[in-house]
Structures are given as C-alpha cells and as structure tokens.
Design a protein with these regions (language model features):
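Active-site region of PLP-dependent enzymes
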Residues: 160-166, 173-284, 316-319
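Active-site phosphate-binding strand-loop segment of PLP-dependent enzymes
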Residues: 106-189, 194-196, 200-201
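Conserved PLP cofactor-binding pocket of PLP-dependent enzymes
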Residues: 212-218, 258, 262, 297-331, ...
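Generic structural signal for small/hydrophobic residues in well-ordered secondary structure
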Residues: 22, 44, 62, 77, ...
Length: 377
C-alpha cells in the first residue's frame, strides 16, 4: 500500500541539475549576495506582478522586516488568530501590538466584519493570511477598507505563491507581500522567503534592514537591522522550483477538484466556499468534519489502515498560545468553533489523481461505517 504524507517537497527530477549548480557555487566561493539571488528576485517580481522583490531567510523574517519598514512601533496591527504563530510574533518583534481578529469560516481567512470593529486611531494596518492558499473576494474588499482608513495592507502569502483573484495577483494586492520557501510550502528552498512590493520606499528600507541596516549606497548604517539574507545555495533551489510554478498549481487544483467532487457537503463533511474568480494554490485542502466525527479516531484509521495522513494545524489558536497569555480571554467564537472540526488533506505532487480518489473513498467508507449512512444537510 502506498504511503501518502501530509506534505512533501517535489523537484521534478531536477536533483542532479540542482546538485551540479551547487557544486559550481562551492567551487566559485560565491555563496552569498550573488547572481542567483539577483535572478530569483527579478523572476519573483515578474511572477508576482510587483516592481521589486527582496530575498530573505524565511517567511517569518519577511513579515518582520516588512513591519519594521512600515514603522509599526507602539501601533496596533490586526491579524487573524488562525495562522502560524510567526505572523503574530513578527508584529511583536517589530515593536507593534497584535490585535487578534476572528475568521470567516467560509474562507478560513480573516473576518472583515471583525476587522471593521477593531480599526481605530492606533491601527497601523492589517495582515491578510491566505489560509491554505485560498484567495477569497474579501482580500479585494479589505484593500478598499484599508485605503479608506489610510492603513497598510500586508499579504501573508506563505501558502499562496501564484494565486490570484480575477486580475488581482497575490503579491501585488497589498502594500507588500511575504512568501515562504519553507520545506512544505508550494515553492521551497528548504528555508527562505521573499518580499514583494511596488513601493520603492518599502523596498529600500527592507533591503537595508536585511543587511544589518546598512545604506545601500554608502558605508553608513541607518537602521538597526540584522543579517536576514538568503544564501546563493537556497536561491538555486528556489529557482529550480519557480520555473515549474504553473505546473505545481495545476496539479494541486486537479487534486482539489477530486476532493470537491467526492467529499460532498453531507452529514460528514462541509466544504469551504470557493469563489469562481479565485485562482487558489491549495497548499493543503481544508474541509470541515461534522461534530459527531472524532478527528483523532479518523486520523488513526487513515494512517494505520489506509496509509495516508490527515492533518490539522494552528491549534491552539494564536490568542490562546502562552506567549499571548494576556489575550487568552478574548472571545473569537467562529475560529474557536471551526478549528476543532477542520482537517487538511494532502495536495502535494506525490499525490496522484488515483491517490486522491482512494483517499475520498476511504474517508467516506470510514465515516459511513462509524457514523451511519449519508444524509443530506
């Protein structure tokens, strides 16, 4: 029986080519700030429709550096509670105050109505997280809201490389965007990230901060920065992935459509709402289970009996994490309810269409056997 992991990087049989390029790098001695970084930044700015791109050592670093460039010290930044902790931690590390918002269960992304309630005179901006690579219409509505209130919009696009809503491309919707190249992401270099922006002021400040705060054109250090740079070796790996981005997204969408077709809204499952104008990247495929289904029982059966992994993440929610203990009594009811029933199915390139069909068949079989026959809801 084929074992299917929750996530796994795929290199299109480019391992030898990557190894040869890295070998040349090792012989050249040029392992930092070289031509591969420049090429990666140039190609990312084109791919994500922005004027500028800055390579950094992680997606979390990308957010932190952007927030420092946006000068959020002692100001509030609205973030969804359902996200990886790096989103909120970056606000704190940049000197700001994270204000946690509820999520819209239909999209898994930040709830606009809660955002509207929490914008005040202290608000510097909003971070929009494209959860699981879903690109909802609400990002366009949020852009208008931020512009109206004269606050920034930062895209956390860790899951959304190559996504779009209509003609709006992820990476050039907000004032800046942050992508992750972590091992399990849509594109990977093992570790790493990229900042995109069409604002030269933000670009120049970010470029300085990642290089210890040094001015780009002279020996003076104007900011309290650090070494947040990506290496040439990581850039080689990222470039090898970037050339296949369309193929990667096409595959993930093909797998997602199989899940959509075979795990219909019924007594057991509930799908997220997907807009016809959304070009999603499906970092993973999210689906809600009904209250009667035990996630732990389901996962054990999927792994032991059928050989595939069902995952869930971002639990506890950010406002329930010990590092944000002062926020723990905050009531974000939608997120607190849905996080307990959310599971994720694999969409990576080692999952073939036949595997996805088998996963659906096995999930339906488990639920029927344990929880009764299907009934419409």
């Amino acid at each position: 029986m084929k074992k299917i992991s929750g996530a796994k990087p795929y290199f299109f049989r480019q391992e030898k080519n990557i190894a040869n390029k890295i070998k040349k790098l090792l012989h050249s001695g040029n392992l930092s700030q070289g031509k591969n970084i420049s090429e990666l930044e140039k190609k990312c700015s084109k791919t994500f429709n922005s004027k500028f791109a800055i390579a950094v050592n992680s997606g979390g670093t990308a957010i932190e550096v952007c927030l420092e460039a946006l000068d959020i010290k002692n100001k509030e930044v609205l973030v969804p509670t359902q996200t990886f902790i790096a989103t909120a931690n970056s606000v704190v590390r940049a000197g700001g105050i994270p204000v946690f918002c509820d999520i819209d269960p239909e999209t898994g992304c930040i709830d606009l109505e809660d955002v509207k309630k929490k914008i005040n005179k202290k608000t510097a901006g909003v971070i929009f997280v494209y959860m699981f690579g879903i690109i909802p219409k609400s990002i366009i509505e949020l852009k208008r809201l931020c512009k109206k209130n004269k606050i920034f919009l930062l895209e956390d696009a860790a899951h959304a490389h190559g996504g779009s809503f209509g003609k709006n491309i992820v990476g050039d919707i907000g004032d800046a965007a942050c992508f992750s190249f972590y091992a399990t992401k849509v594109l990977t270099s093992g570790e790493g990230g990229i900042i995109t922006t069409s604002n030269k002021k933000i670009k120049d400040k970010c470029s300085s901060i990642i290089n210890h705060g040094r001015n780009l054109h002279n020996p003076y250090f104007n900011y309290s920065g650090n070494n947040f740079r990506l290496t040439e070796i990581q850039a080689v790996i990222a470039l090898s992935q970037l050339k296949y981005l369309k193929k990667i997204i096409s595959h993930r969408n093909k797998i997602a459509k199989i899940y959509q077709k075979n795990l219909i809204n019924n007594l057991f499952f509930k799908q997220l709402s997907i807009d016809k104008n959304s070009k999603n990247t499906y970092w993973r495929y999210p689906i809600y289970l009904s209250d009667q289904i035990s996630r732990n029982v389901l996962r054990k059966l999927c792994e032991k009996k059928y050989g595939f992994r069902v995952t869930w993440m971002y639990e506890p929610l950010c406002h329930k994490q010990p590092v944000f203990n002062s926020k723990s009594k905050l009531k974000l009811l939608k997120a607190e309810k849905t996080i307990k029933s959310l599971i994720n199915l694999p969409t990576h390139l080692f999952v073939k269409p036949t595997d996805a069909i088998r996963i659906c068949k096995n999930l339906n079989e488990i639920c029927r056997n344990l929880y009764g026959k299907k009934k419409s809801i």
